[in-house]
């Protein structure tokens, strides 16, 4: 599957931008942005999105029922394995959708399923604190400051 990359200087949310692209009949792709002004987290929480961090959403059609919990866990394991090569500290998976280092959140995943024109799409949103972190006690960690 070859995915086109849609890069933006700023969006409200990469997941919302993916939904907008799907509604323009774009079937698959990757959305990236330098910043998000209204990033989304689990259960309606806001993902604080500062410049220098990674904000990405991957979207594509899916044909059958999928277990989102298993997909989220698999994605967390993949990202954890990538970060293990960069970060000298233990990386922990905090279910349902976070990675933590030194008990501080550095990565979150938000997956959504939408239906458009009778097609089922999966959107995988990933946020990683690389350069900066929010000034929220639980999240005060970025990879560059480890």
Locate each region found by the language model.
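Cytochrome P450 core scaffold surrounding the K-helix E-X-X-R motif
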Residues: 132-140
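Conserved small/polar residues in nucleotide/adenosyl-binding loops
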Residues: 144-146
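Acidic (Asp/Glu) carboxylate-rich active-site/surface patches
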Residues: 82-117, 127
């Amino acid at each position: 599957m070859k995915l086109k990359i849609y890069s933006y200087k700023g969006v409200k949310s990469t997941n919302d931008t993916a939904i907008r692209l799907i509604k323009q009949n774009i079937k698959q792709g990757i959305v990236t942005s330098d910043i998000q002004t209204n990033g989304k987290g689990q259960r309606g929480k806001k993902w604080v999105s500062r410049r220098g961090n990674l904000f990405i959403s991957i979207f594509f059609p899916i044909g059958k029922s999928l277990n989102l919990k298993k997909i989220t866990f698999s994605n967390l394991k993949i990202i954890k394995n990538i970060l293990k090569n960069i970060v000298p500290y233990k990386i922990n998976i905090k279910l349902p959708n976070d990675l933590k280092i030194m008990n501080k959140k550095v990565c979150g995943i938000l997956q959504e399923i939408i239906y458009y024109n009778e097609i089922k799409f999966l959107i995988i949103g990933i946020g990683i604190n690389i350069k900066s972190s929010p000034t929220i006690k639980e999240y005060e960690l970025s990879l560059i400051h480890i």
